[in-house]
Amino acid sequence: MKTKITDTSNAINAGGRAEKWWKGKPVKSRSSSWTRNQDDVDLQSILQRYNLKGFEFGNWLNNNERYDRVLACEDSLAELSKIIGSKNLGIESLVGIAFGARGMSKAAAHYEPGYNMINITKMDGDGCLAHEYGHALDYNLGKYVDQNKRYNYLSGGRSVSKTLTGNQGGNLRNIMNELVDEASSMLNVRLDEYLDKKFGKNPKEENMRRAKARMQGSFMYWRYRHEIFARLFEQCCCYKLKQKQSSDMFLTSSWAFYTKSNAALFYWPEAEFKRLLPKMDKLIRVFKITLNIK
């Protein structure tokens, strides 16, 4: 019989929806411990292996769903550690992972820099771990390792600038910005061409001008520098698995999703991606060196 899986510590729930729910139920006690046997998922072993802060589970995940998420996540962490070349994925226990505990409206998954938590939603979070982990790398290595007074994120965060002259630093920050500059340039050309083709370069009709402006506004999110890096990182993880004739649908989406689906507009066609790959590989090598420093 499976033992009930619960959060790995009381501290991990800070800021989560599950914490808020329990705060509103003061007459109920909450279990914060669990007993392992040989049939159980060993949460502490996974945390120690990858230096993670902890796991958090939403109240709306039943025990079987918790097992499924943890087992899928464990496999994905193993793949991620091979791609990066380090098991220090939690960056000295800074980063934790939540399952269905911190959901945001319309978001399949998200990263919370304030609490350093990656949240994978109950229903739609499959394929999102690499993307959100890319955010965690970008933020933590920028805030604590290769620092810049203006930008916590190595990439420059929510800036939409094609280049950031003030975002200078050491190897991590400089290589990251070379990569994001080039990826941003490719993406912006493609998005602008799409808008011009759909509405015309200078539409004469008022309704077309307004429609184009609305779509330009909706594209802003896709132009954020930290989002560009996270999407490129997840696409890179998928490509590395594809090279081994493998896939991991909890870690990333399929290669066809990135290159042939409707979402492909916001990623990089294979030819463009391969032009970016040497810079991405260079950055991953520096990630490896940084994460493996004792």
Question: Where are the regions a protein language model picked out?
Answer:
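Active-site-flanking segments in enzyme catalytic domains
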Residues: 2-69, 86-294
